[in-house]
């Protein structure tokens, strides 16, 4: 079975690039038994955009949030804007269980900020 997620190799390239393992949990159901086998796949149109292959997880339903652990510095540092995908925000899970946003998500304005190839963009109303 496949589980498609909003994230993709743009956000975490290591599994797609060389099969790196990242533990995955289903938020709020961490203590449920892992009874289903899934390929967890990203949103790119590439056959290697996968976060996990044959991973045992609890049953996943539409709307569930998946936590991909130990992404750390690899997410942003190896990220890229393939297919026009914007980089996600980065969240830090602290030892006390609190979460802090340490980098905001990119916006379309960020994506086009370095373009300076002609006046066409400046003259759009």
Language model features by range: what are they?
Residues 1-125:
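Charged (often Lys/Glu-rich) extended helix/loop segments that serve as interaction or gating elements
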